[in-house]
From Swiss-Prot:
Homodimer. Part of the ribosomal stalk of the 50S ribosomal subunit. Forms a multimeric L10(L12)X complex, where L10 forms an elongated spine to which 2 to 4 L12 dimers bind in a sequential fashion. Binds GTP-bound translation factors. It comes from the Bacteria. Forms part of the ribosomal stalk which helps the ribosome interact with GTP-bound translation factors. Is thus essential for accurate translation. One of its GO terms (biological process) is translation. Belongs to the bacterial ribosomal protein bL12 family. Keywords: Ribonucleoprotein, Ribosomal protein. This is Large ribosomal subunit protein bL12. HAMAP family: Ribosomal_bL12.
Length: 122
C-alpha cells in the first residue's frame, strides 16, 4: 500500500531541523531541482491590516551570554547542540523558527531575550 500524504507530513513533523535540511538536499540531488522560495502575489489591501497568523523568530544579536543563548536555541528548535551553536555563531540576523503562532513566538522571544539575545518577530 502506498504511503499517504498525511503519513509523510506526520513523519516530517517529527523530524529535527538538521534532518529536514538533509532531506531537502537529498531531494534536490535526486531530482535535479533547487528548492527556492516562491514569490507570492500581493495580498488584498484588507488582508494586510489583519494581525499576522504566523511569524518568524529572528535573532539579530547574541549578546554577552552566548552559552545561555545556545542552550535556549537548542531547547526551542529541537536541534542538536552543534547545530544550535552554528546558528548562534553564524552571521546575523538568523531565523530561529518560522511559521510560529504569535503567542508562541512571544514566549520564544521572552526566553531568548532573558538569555541575552536580541530578537525581532517578523
Amino acid at each position: 500500500m502506498p504511503i499517504t500524504k498525511d503519513e509523510i507530513i506526520k513523519a516530517l513533523e517529527e523530524m529535527k531541523l538538521n534532518e529536514l535540511n538533509e532531506l531537502v538536499k537529498a531531494i534536490e540531488d535526486h531530482f535535479g531541482v533547487v528548492a527556492s522560495v516562491g514569490v507570492a502575489a500581493a495580498a488584498p489591501a484588507e488582508a494586510t491590516n489583519a494581525a499576522p497568523t504566523e511569524v518568524s523568530v529572528v535573532m539579530t544579536s547574541v549578546g554577552q551570554q552566548k552559552v545561555a543563548v545556545i542552550k535556549v536555541v537548542k531547547e526551542l528548535t529541537g536541534v542538536g547542540l552543534m547545530d544550535a551553536k552554528k546558528m548562534v555563531d553564524g552571521a546575523m540576523p538568523v531565523t530561529i523558527k518560522e511559521h510560529v503562532k504569535p503567542e508562541e513566538a512571544e514566549e520564544m522571544k521572552a526566553k531568548l531575550v532573558e538569555a541575552g539575545a536580541s530578537i525581532d518577530l517578523k
